Regions:
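Cytochrome P450
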Residues: 1-315
Length: 315
């Protein structure tokens, strides 16, 4: 099939993704395993979306496809200490008092906007913790590496809003996690699966390539929609439901193979601190009446995040 004959990403799917990822991705998968952007000119005219499981997973680490890297390989050598598992533990310990203080202040105020009051300042606090622990050389922290790290911290805590949303909507879950903290790890993995930090991983064709029987020319931006795969119902572990107490569901939110997120240890340790402190200090906080969480489905691989999260003390 030629790209021009490929079905487009349905408008109803894109609209649904803003409030219901399960419905949105289901509508996209029903339209076909490979979809093109509806734009016929401009920067999005060469965007293609793979939403089928086989089409996504087969190409996450395909050497034939180019991918954008935030930093060159030579710079990544400097980050070995930062990405070490021990550093993630040290960073989480350094970050915990700040997280506890922010959550305490939020709870004492009776709530507010958790994005503005909790998760956004946490991003700066995490960056400062990296600096205090000297996990990156000063010249790199003040250069390109520091810029990338700062953006990564912001993206991590944009994603953290989904954890707080689920906890605010489900007081019984808060109680379970408080009584059984060993389940917090599974809870974190489930939110990572259901609300991936980046819903699609971008790859770039450098030569004519066939994906899911669709012939793609060179210079196509291929969006591998892991968000669609992780909810596709192909097995009992890939559903729209949050399930804990069985075992962690497999997901590709943090990449795969050579494209696996090297900061994965940090992501998990920091999110664990956030959830532990929240269920201990703010389990009585709930979603503000009448608020309906909505996001804008990104046309690039930008983070899908909640711009606001108004919470109040449970009556």
């Amino acid at each position: 099939m030629k790209l021009a004959d490929c079905p487009v990403f349905p408008a109803e799917a894109a609209n649904a993704l803003s409030t219901d990822r399960g419905l949105g991705w289901r509508l996209a998968r029903q339209a076909g395993p490979v979809l093109r952007h509806p734009a016929t000119n401009g920067m999005f005219a060469n965007f293609v979306f793979a939403v089928g499981r086989e089409e996504v997973l087969a190409n996450l680490d395909d050497a034939r496809l180019d991918r954008a890297r935030a930093l060159p390989e030579s710079d990544l050598q400097v980050h070995q200490q930062l990405f070490a598992p021990k550093s993630a533990h040290d960073l989480a310990a350094q970050f915990r008092p700040t997280a506890a203080a922010l959550i305490d202040r939020f709870a004492a105020a009776g709530g507010g906007d958790a994005v503005a009051d909790v998760t956004t300042p946490m991003a700066d606090a995490l960056f400062d913790s990296v600096s205090r622990l000297q996990l990156l050389p000063v010249e790199h922290l003040n250069g390109r590496s520091g810029h990338v790290l700062s953006e990564a911290c912001r993206n991590l805590f944009k994603h953290a809003g989904w954890h707080l949303l689920e906890l605010a909507c489900n007081p019984e879950l808060c109680d379970v996690l408080r009584r059984q903290p060993e389940l917090i790890r599974e809870f974190i993995e489930e939110i990572l699966r259901l609300e991936p930090m980046v819903p699609s991983c971008q790859r770039f064709t450098t030569q004519p390539t066939t994906i899911g029987e669709v012939e793609l020319p060179a210079d196509v931006v291929l969006n591998l929609c892991i968000g669609a795969v992780q909810r596709d119902g192909s097995d009992p572990m890939s559903t729209d439901d949050l399930v804990i107490g069985v075992r962690a569901h497999r997901h590709w939110t943090l990449g795969a193979g050579s494209m696996r997120c090297q900061g994965g240890h940090i992501v998990r340790q920091v999110l664990r601190v956030l959830v532990e402190e929240w269920v201990d200090r703010a389990g009585h906080i709930e979603l503000a009446p009448g608020f309906r969480p909505a996001v804008a489905f990104p046309t690039t691989q930008s983070v899908l995040w909640l711009p606001e999260l108004p919470l109040v003390t449970r009556a």
